[in-house]
């Protein structure tokens, strides 16, 4: 329910003459939206939204054209499944990857998710946990770590990674420290000179490219990033 609770308050859905298309990969998406908007959960039913609403359900790996953007989809590891989206237009690309758990054995060069995010200008990455938390007490919770995000961004040559889906219990002070530790990890790794066999120029240990990511940021309400 926490994934959908903003929909009943989506103002454009109540405006007559608006046309709204919900895109997703969950086959049960229409049923889920209807069920959450009924008493006793919510006083207004989904059918009372005045806009003209339709659904388009896609399969993982599909590529569709939406509002001038090429949109690609990928299935992700999360309880109940989740899906990541890659948006491409005018030579720029943004990947939105929420509610995804990338495990320790995924830190290998042939991991398919790396191809999905490769060369992205911006990767919006779900990472509420430290590396130790993600592989320990919070394993199987469906989320990833800051270190994993930086590792993937480096190996896939992503220019900018912004971390989001913060721990609800985290304070502003904790989040600032989390960002600082993430940037420190990148700085230390870039300044660690380790011999690498058969490495291409700019490529570090285990497929890491020391040139990427160029920037790390932390998401917040109202954040605007130009790509």
What are these regions (language model features)?
Residues 1-95, 103, 114-115, 173-227:
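Binuclear metal-dependent hydrolase catalytic cores
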Residues 99:
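Conserved acidic
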Residues 104-208, 212-214:
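Cap/insert and terminal regions of metallo-dependent hydrolase folds
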């Amino acid at each position: 329910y926490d994934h959908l609770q903003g929909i009943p308050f989506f103002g454009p859905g109540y405006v007559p003459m608006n046309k709204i298309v919900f895109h997703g990969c969950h086959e049960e998406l229409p049923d889920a939206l209807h069920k959450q908007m009924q008493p006793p959960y919510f006083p207004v039913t989904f059918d009372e939204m005045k806009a003209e609403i339709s659904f388009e359900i896609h399969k993982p790996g599909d590529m569709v054209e939406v509002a001038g953007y090429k949109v690609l989809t990928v299935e992700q590891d999360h309880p109940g499944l989740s899906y990541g989206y890659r948006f491409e237009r005018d030579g720029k690309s943004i990947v939105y990857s929420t509610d995804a758990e990338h495990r320790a054995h995924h830190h290998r060069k042939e991991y398919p998710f790396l191809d999905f995010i490769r060369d992205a200008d911006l990767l919006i990455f779900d990472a509420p946990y430290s590396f130790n938390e993600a592989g320990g007490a919070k394993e199987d919770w469906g989320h990833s770590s800051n270190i994993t995000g930086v590792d993937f961004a480096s190996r896939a040559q992503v220019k900018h990674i912004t971390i989001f889906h913060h721990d609800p219990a985290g304070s502003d002070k904790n989040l600032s420290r989390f960002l600082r530790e993430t940037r420190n990890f990148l700085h230390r790794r870039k300044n660690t000179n380790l011999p690498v066999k058969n490495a291409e120029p700019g490529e570090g240990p285990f497929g890491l490219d020391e040139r990427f990511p160029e920037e790390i940021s932390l998401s917040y309400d109202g954040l605007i990033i130009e790509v």
